[in-house]
């Protein structure tokens, strides 16, 4: 019986923490604007007049984007650096995030990205638009 009281108290504390967190979202301005989140939620068929829920989705989205960017950076750092012969270029150690790095990071989250065909790789490049078979 004591176990039931403890779990009830823990549930009450969780509910109170959730209520407090949702209330704090009213004073928070997320990185991703409310209008943008509302647009994509509506596009997916979700309508909600509660700003707190929209901001909760914005915070979750922001965290997802930050996690993917961090993972992509780790993939970028793990990639072998190209051999540079010029001493000036050796001092410049900027990392270049590639689509391959981003694809690997997204794949860890179950998102498969197809690389778009480059315009220059298209068989119809340089052809008259009227004669293209695309």
UniProtKB/Swiss-Prot annotation:
Which BP terms in the Gene Ontology apply to this protein? Answer: DNA-templated transcription initiation
Task: Give the superkingdom in one word.
Answer: Eukaryota
The answer to whether UniProt assigns keyword Transcription to this entry is yes
The cysteines joined by S-S bonds are none
Q: Does the keyword Nucleus apply?
A: yes
Q: Where in the cell is it found?
A: Nucleus
Record keywords: Activator, Nucleus, Transcription, Transcription regulation
Please give the record's induction comment: Up-regulated by auxin and cytokinin.
Under InterPro entries, the record lists: TAF10
Q: In which tissues is it expressed?
A: Expressed in roots, stems, leaves and inflorescences. Expressed preferentially in the vascular bundles and bundle sheath cells of cotyledons, the phloem of hypocotyls and the central cylinders of roots.
Q: Can you list the GO cellular component terms from the UniProt entry?
A: nucleus
Query: Remarks, anything else?
Result: Overexpression of TAF10 results in salt tolerance during seed germination while knock-down mutants are more sensitive to osmotic stress and display several abnormal phenotypes involved in meristem activity and leaf development.
Name the job this protein performs. Answer: TAFs are components of the transcription factor IID (TFIID) complex that is essential for mediating regulation of RNA polymerase transcription. Involved in osmotic stress adaptation during the germination stage and in gene expression related to meristem activity and leaf development.
Q: Which family does it belong to?
A: Belongs to the TAF10 family.
Q: Quaternary form?
A: Component of the TFIID complex. TFIID is composed of TATA binding protein (TBP) and a number of TBP-associated factors (TAFs) whose MWs range from 14-217 kDa. Can homodimerize. Interacts with TAF4, TAF4B, TAF8, TAF9, TAF12B and TAF13.
Write the protein's name.
Transcription initiation factor TFIID subunit 10
- Whichever gene encodes this chain, its name is TAF10
């Amino acid at each position: 019986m004591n176990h039931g009281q403890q779990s009830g108290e823990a549930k009450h504390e969780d509910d109170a923490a959730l209520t407090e967190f949702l209330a704090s979202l009213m004073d928070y301005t997320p990185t991703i604007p409310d209008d943008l989140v509302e647009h994509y939620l509506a596009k997916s068929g979700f309508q909600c007049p509660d700003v707190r829920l929209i901001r909760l989705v914005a915070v979750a989205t922001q965290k997802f984007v930050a996690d993917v960017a961090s993972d992509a950076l780790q993939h970028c750092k793990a990639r072998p650096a190209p051999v540079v012969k010029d001493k000036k270029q050796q001092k410049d150690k900027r990392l270049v995030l590639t689509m391959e790095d981003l694809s690997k990071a997204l794949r860890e989250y179950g998102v498969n990205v197809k690389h778009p065909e480059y315009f220059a790789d298209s068989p119809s490049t340089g052809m008259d638009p009227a004669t293209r078979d695309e």
